[in-house]
């Protein structure tokens, strides 16, 4: 797993004071991004270091009784539970084979939706484990109807297997802040059929906005990950011990 992250204060969104390095391998949809600060650190960073420590992923397998699935759950990580995530934006998310992610939700007839509020658990019909969605901490399944995550216009229709480059999502009700728990907050769930030939990696890069709760100053960070997706032959090992590319929550 390869990852980078950094912090910046609101107001420094033009790129001034930051040197941007982005290496893209478009053919395989593998992307790396790094930003190097050349300006003075923010007062927040000086006071307590960088509170946003990057993105991380849990990789697991799931069997729905018929098929095996690879599941990647993405998290935003912080140094404490005092921070609430407002939005994730400017994303670049995909798989090396370009086929994207599985959908299994209320919008199946339209190709499936990235809205978590569509990810219901209806036996024999819809299963959130094999559905792909983005979220700002809220739950799905029995909690889907209460999920207040909304998609940015940059998401387009919000339908289909792939996320448009630059897409974002946000907490529609920031007065109901979604604070980190155990130093992290769930921001996305990505399902892929384990029988897919040629699937090797998933890449995730995005910016994130966060604060200390309603009415407080907004800060921004970003990070990127390249996540190895195990080969089909690894399913037996995964079933025995599991595979994680981050330390699991207590």
Predicted regions and their residues:
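Boundary/junction segments of secreted and surface-exposed precursor proteins
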Residues: 45-65
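Low-complexity, serine/threonine/proline/glycine-rich extracellular segments that form mucin-like
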Residues: 60-157
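Ser/Thr/Pro-rich, low-complexity mucin-like regions
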Residues: 78-80, 163, 168-223
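Cleavable N-terminal signal peptides
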Residues: 34-35, 45
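A short, hydrophobic C-terminal helix/tail in secreted or cell-surface proteins
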Residues: 230-246
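Bacterial N-terminal signal peptides that target proteins for export
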Residues: 25-33
């Amino acid at each position: 797993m390869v990852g980078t992250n950094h912090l910046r204060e609101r107001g420094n969104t033009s790129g001034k004071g930051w040197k941007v390095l982005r290496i893209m391998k478009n053919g395989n949809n593998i992307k790396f991004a790094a930003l190097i600060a050349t300006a003075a650190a923010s007062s927040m960073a000086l006071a307590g270091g960088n509170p946003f420590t990057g993105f991380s992923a849990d990789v697991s397998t799931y069997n729905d009784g018929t098929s095996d699935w690879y599941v990647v759950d993405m998290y935003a990580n912080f140094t404490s539970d005092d921070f609430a995530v407002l939005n994730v934006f400017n994303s670049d998310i995909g798989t090396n084979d370009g086929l994207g992610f599985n959908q299994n939700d209320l919008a199946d007839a339209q190709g499936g939706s990235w809205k978590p509020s569509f990810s219901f658990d209806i036996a024999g019909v819809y299963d959130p484990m094999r559905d792909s969605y983005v979220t700002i901490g809220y739950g799905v399944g029995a909690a889907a109807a209460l999920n207040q995550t909304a998609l940015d216009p940059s998401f387009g229709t919000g339908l289909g297997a792939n996320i448009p480059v630059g897409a974002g999502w946000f907490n529609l009700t920031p007065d109901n802040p979604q604070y980190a728990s155990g130093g992290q907050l769930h921001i996305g769930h990505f399902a892929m059929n384990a029988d897919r030939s040629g699937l090797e990696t998933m890449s995730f890069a995005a910016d994130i906005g966060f604060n200390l709760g309603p009415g407080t100053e907004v800060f921004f960070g970003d990070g990127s990950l390249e996540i190895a997706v195990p080969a089909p032959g690894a399913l037996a090992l995964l079933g025995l011990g599991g595979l994680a590319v981050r330390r699991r929550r207590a």
